[in-house]
């Protein structure tokens, strides 16, 4: 840890793992790609996560230039994971560029949105509503639980 953690005197060079977060000024695929290229170009980068559809597509765009993503970490591949289920992300999961991704349930998100709107219209107090996320990879994309949640 560094900065207000276990060893505040530690440096990045002392760390076994460095978690780097990059947020572009605007959320476009191009700007996310620039940030992802900077991370993927680092020596010893072992994994990258695109935290939404635009960021995940940015990671894939960066990989088009660098060709470092894959599923064999032992062979030096950088492990890529995305969040969402657009056609570009699904194709990357299918072909092994991403090892998988997390998707949401659009049906349940819509259900809870209507539930919350109705409650608000009736003057009821609203609370946070948790929504499920589902891991998918090339082995379960066609399953009954996952397939309905893989939207474009």
Map each language-model feature to its residues:
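Hinge/beta->alpha junction and helix N-cap segments in small-molecule ligand-binding domains
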Residues: 1-34, 50-55, 81-86, 103-112, ...
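Sec-exported extracytoplasmic/periplasmic mature domains
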Residues: 2-10, 37-44, 53, 60-68, ...
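Hinge/cleft segment of the Venus flytrap/periplasmic-binding protein
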Residues: 3-7, 105-152
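A generic structural signal for alpha->beta connector loops
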Residues: 14-17, 75-77, 98
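Hydrophobic alpha-helical
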Residues: 24-91
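Alpha-helical scaffold segments in soluble metabolic enzymes
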Residues: 58, 92, 112, 116
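Flexible loop/hinge segments that line or gate small-molecule binding clefts
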Residues: 86-94, 98-99, 139, 145-147
